[in-house]
Amino acid sequence: MQVDLLGSAQSAHALHLFHQHSPLVHCMTNDVVQTFTANTLLALGASPAMVIETEEASQFAAIASALLINVGTLTQPRAQAMRAAVEQAKSSQTPWTLDPVAVGALDYRRHFCHELLSFKPAAIRGNASEIMALAGIANGGRGVDTTDAAANAIPAAQTLARETGAIVVVTGEMDYVTDGHRIIGIHGGDPLMTKVVGTGCALSAVVAACCALPGDTLENVASACHWMKQAGERAVARSEGPGSFVPHFLDALWQLTQEVQA
């Protein structure tokens, strides 16, 4: 199994494209992370919109550049709105990304996520336990936290990618991104990033945005992981803990975009 590393030139090119296209991202995400997710997208140059009402979700999915479905705080009304948005996204050819939060721990969301897979997501982003559970290999995880190493989920990610046609992202100490054939590994980040709610969920929104960019979607999605890890490292170097990490992280994302435009 060959894992290729993402080059810095590829990442910089993708970030330039990101800022140039400024994707409009329809984020149907969980209640805990909405502000952080929106600010992450804004710092990178995207335009976030948090439209969740069923009557509006379908309409907005048709005009957005990309759609994110995050099941972190799933309810039946929210599932109805998400289903409507995904159906419209497929009809309108809007690329959509699934973040199957805690899919291995709870039956309702597992069944719902499996139902959504039939609408062919452009990308799926989760931790190792979530990806393995979604692929039907294991039902692990400790709530929203993983109990498996990212590398152990690569076979499940490849299977899921081949079955759905999605780019699958497994996040951890090292991130792995695959289309079922190629695998790209991304080093970096810091353990402190796991002590702040929303870093993974925000990454899923950035992944969704990257699916709307021209060029190699696998490399564009891998670049999203690289930007987040780079910004995390910079933020940790300047912060004293989780509380001061967040503003430094957003600043670091912004600075990355300024550097590729210089």
Curated annotation (Swiss-Prot):
Keyword set, alphabetical order: ATP-binding, Kinase, Magnesium, Metal-binding, Nucleotide-binding, Thiamine biosynthesis, Transferase
Molecular function as annotated in GO: ATP binding; hydroxyethylthiazole kinase activity; identical protein binding; magnesium ion binding; prenol kinase activity
Binding, substrate: M50, G198
The entry's ATP-binding residues are R125, T171
Keyword Metal-binding (UniProt): yes
Q: What is its EC number?
A: 2.7.1.50
Give one Pfam family: HK
* Similarity annotation: Belongs to the Thz kinase family.
Name of this chain's protein:
Hydroxyethylthiazole kinase
Taxonomic lineage of the native organism: Bacteria, Pseudomonadati, Pseudomonadota, Gammaproteobacteria, Enterobacterales
